[in-house]
Amino acid sequence: MDEEHKQNMGPPPELKKISDSIWELPASYKKGMLVPARIIANKELIDAMDAGVFNQITNVASLPGIQSYAYCMPDGHWGYGFPIGGVAAFDPEQGGVISPGGIGFDINCGMRLISTNLTIDEVKPKIKQLVDELYKAVPAGVGCKGFVKITKEEFKNVMKDGAQWCLKNGYAWPGDVENIEDQGKIVQANPDKVSDRAVKRGLDQLGTLGSGNHYLEIQEVVAGNIYDEKAAKAMGITGPGQIVIMVHCGSRGMGHQVGTDYLKTFLEVMPKYGIQILDPELACAPFNSPEGQDYYQAMACAANMAFANRQVITHRIREVFSKVFGRSAEEMQMNLVYDVAHNIAKLEEHVVDGKKKMLLVHRKGSTRAFGPSRAKDLPEKYTKIGQPIILGGSMETGSYLLVGTDGADLTFSSTAHGAGRTMSRAQAKREVRGDELQKNMEKNGIYVHAVTMSGLAEEAGKAYKDIEVVVDSLEAAGITRRVVALKPIGNVKG
């Protein structure tokens, strides 16, 4: 969020209340809108939302081929093109487009959760050693490089096979892949559509966190915070005091370069397709055009790199825990609960006006949220409960494990991705001192090892919305259900 959008808060007067958690701006709100825009949020969040969100989501509603509504989730805030938290589905058969601004530059930025059989009593005495060892094993910060050394030719296999490349090369357990969205591999990936510059930027970044809001966090299941015991058990969450590990990162410099490359291309070709947009940040091309397909195939390569990146990080986490606790990762039952993307476009079947359609669903700071009726797309153990959703909160307040519901059909099976910012990074740095924040967090039982103190200040808890209010809104809208709240005890910050 920048200062311009922060200053002007609150909804436009045309915003209509559909329910306590659904709000709508009609297609008549702005010239060019093809469908209404809907925001999933309670009144508290709506009143505090920056004006940029309402402007951007109504711009999205003007893109060719959009279906039903343009959506924004309760964690929504101003972004590039789409707001963060934006969801839109396009019908390729009706000229539906693909837009890098609806996916984000960090393609397949996503979340991963690893369970263990360790308890807080075992981990707390070693938390500093554990976090410091993880900091050494998983490089973080701008331009950091990973330990996996591969040739450009082998990197093509990473781009094609994603986390499945990791399985073939000793960085994954056989059970990991089934617990990743799309089994960790988007099949449409075509390395020939990725520029040399993008390849160069990704080549040495496997197994790295990067910077910004990316992190690796050790978390505790606290008594009273298990809301659905059956769903929790299916995910390997057995009771209070259990330790889990959360990872948040994406495709690093490679994804950014893919987005940059194709934004330029789309700005050049839009006149050829007669596309006019309300904001150049929404540059797009018809999905079925050669340029649209090229970007989709390149995006899939970056998404696969991100799946592989989180998998290599998981391998390193298992190694560090084995070293610190003197036990194998298998003995500690360090199983992958789930891995889910929240910056991506996916071809999915959805019902529009009673008719099944294959749509291109853009999720930008939004998570897929399949309910039990989409069982064929889920691991067998989750077919009765719905897809796990990993919702990252701030590093001071904690995170949530949720499940998707069939009610999420309302939003093209999409939900939020985190708490969402309320404050720009620049403002956070003005208001918070990183060293003081680090000390306060340690007093509150959270040991954090950060690359820079200014980067730590950017991610202070006060820079984010209250995750409880975000989750309340999701549940009230019927698109997500609480399973477990997780409390941070240690954090590696990029």
What annotation goes with each model-predicted range?
Residues 2-56, 66-72, 80-84, 92-102, ...:
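Domain-length cofactor-binding catalytic modules of enzymes
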Residues 62-63:
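Short, conserved catalytic or adaptor-binding loops enriched in Gly and charged residues
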Residues 109-117:
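Acidic/polar active-site rim loop that often engages polyanionic ligands
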Residues 120:
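Patatin-like phospholipase
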